[in-house]
Amino acid sequence: MALISLAIDYKKSPIEVRSEFALSGLDVSMLYRSILAIDNVVHAVILSTCNRTEVYLEISDLRVVDDILVWWQGYVRNPNYKIKDYFKLRQGTEVIMHLMKLACGLESMVLGEPQILGQVKDSYTLSKKNHAIGKELDRVFQKVFATAKRVRSETRIGHCPVSVAFSAITLAKRQLDNISSKNVLIIGAGQTGELLFRHVTALAPKQIMLANRTIEKAQKITSAFRNASAHYLSELPQLIKKADIIIAAVNVLEYIVTCKYVGDKPRVFIDISIPQALDPKLGELEQNVYYCVDDINAVIEDNKDKRKYESSKAQKIIVKSLEEYLEKEKAIISNSAIKELFQKADGLVDLSLEKSLAKIRNGKDAEEIIKRFAYEIKKKVLHYPVVGMKEASKQGRSDCLVCMKRMFGLNVEK
């Protein structure tokens, strides 16, 4: 079984590309059913956030990568975007190292951001719910979560108040000096939307409107604040008229706010959704200011220096954690092989022993039977090692011959 991952992220792909290849907003159960239906795909975990879409897989044949790319391409709306031009393939240990760094926030646009760990955990949970995760992949994710927990407790990488949500609010503050007199509309009440809401409430705006598909979730977030209100997405045309700042963090497959919704009133539009929820053409109107996820980079760069030292400490923890994981996996593989070896030997002995005992019970010469039994066991036990040594010799594999000699306690110098 091989471990691989296929990824499209902000490092190689701009927002319009990431939007096309995003798997968020689609039916999760359908996604898992379809990917597990591909021959040689054994287990899978799908992660889709605003900055990346990644698929982690246990496969039985590396040639299946082409089939997975075809599967992914099938969800792309614009045929001009070809996944082979953008994806990154990782294999084996590289997958585990990347996932550890990712969960610790070291691969994020915002170095050390804590939200990614929750997103990775959510993806893992959905995979388990859809019976898509196996023992090996499960062990990988459990070690990843333990590593992230250790990094958070032993470093200060997550202590600076920096996230995509925080950076979005920073951009809004740069455009509007006095937010206390402004109305803010947040679209989406998911994890990022809730984080946006917290940052906005700290600025004490005149009014906060939170719109979501299900109003119950929005109500739960806004209920403790007198200047906050919960709304359905269907109310967006009316809400936009009132708003000075519109921030979107929602999973949609097409723009839900376009130029037809806005008049001449100056507004700040910030879209951190993938795929994009706010039409970029909003920024072409003279009175508006428009930002997308990629524009947040400038804000993030200002905060990177504060976290670089903590990042190096986190890297050391990750390297150590990976070494621990690999050692444990070696032991698991070794123990499994040893168990199988003993089971094989038991099968050989049991069959020959039963035949020998039956002959003795029938009055045959016990000494002769025991000698014959010992000879048969020796022959059966050594059959496959002898075949293997002959094959290794034919292929000039002296390393295999040395290994086999050591296994049987033979002199490796001869």
From Swiss-Prot:
Further details from the record: During catalysis, the active site Cys acts as a nucleophile attacking the alpha-carbonyl group of tRNA-bound glutamate with the formation of a thioester intermediate between enzyme and glutamate, and the concomitant release of tRNA(Glu). The thioester intermediate is finally reduced by direct hydride transfer from NADPH, to form the product GSA.
SUPFAM superfamilies: Glutamyl tRNA-reductase catalytic, N-terminal domain, Glutamyl tRNA-reductase dimerization domain, NAD(P)-binding Rossmann-fold domains
Keyword NADP: yes
Summary of subunit composition and partner proteins: Homodimer.
Protein name per UniProt: Glutamyl-tRNA reductase
Annotated site location: Important for activity: 98
Pathway participation: Porphyrin-containing compound metabolism; protoporphyrin-IX biosynthesis; 5-aminolevulinate from L-glutamyl-tRNA(Glu): step 1/2
GO BP, sorted A to Z: protoporphyrinogen IX biosynthetic process from glutamate
Organism: Francisella tularensis subsp. tularensis (strain WY96-3418)
Pfam families attached to this UniProt entry: GlutR_dimer (PF00745), GlutR_N (PF05201), Shikimate_DH (PF01488)
Active-site residues from the entry: 50
Domains: entry comment: Possesses an unusual extended V-shaped dimeric structure with each monomer consisting of three distinct domains arranged along a curved 'spinal' alpha-helix. The N-terminal catalytic domain specifically recognizes the glutamate moiety of the substrate. The second domain is the NADPH-binding domain, and the third C-terminal domain is responsible for dimerization.
Residues that hold substrate according to the record: 49-52, 108, 113-115, 119
Disulfide bonds: none
UniProt-listed Enzyme Commission number(s): 1.2.1.70
GO molecular function, one term: NADP binding
Keywords: NADP, Oxidoreductase, Porphyrin biosynthesis
The protein's role, per its UniProt record: Catalyzes the NADPH-dependent reduction of glutamyl-tRNA(Glu) to glutamate 1-semialdehyde (GSA).
Catalysed reactions listed for this entry: (S)-4-amino-5-oxopentanoate + tRNA(Glu) + NADP(+) = L-glutamyl-tRNA(Glu) + NADPH + H(+)
Binding site for NADP(+): 188-193
InterPro entries cross-referenced by the UniProt entry: 4pyrrol_synth_GluRdtase, 4pyrrol_synth_GluRdtase_dimer, 4pyrrol_synth_GluRdtase_N, GluRdtase_CS, GluRdtase_dimer_dom_sf, GluRdtase_N_sf, NAD(P)-bd_dom_sf, Shikm_DH/Glu-tRNA_Rdtase
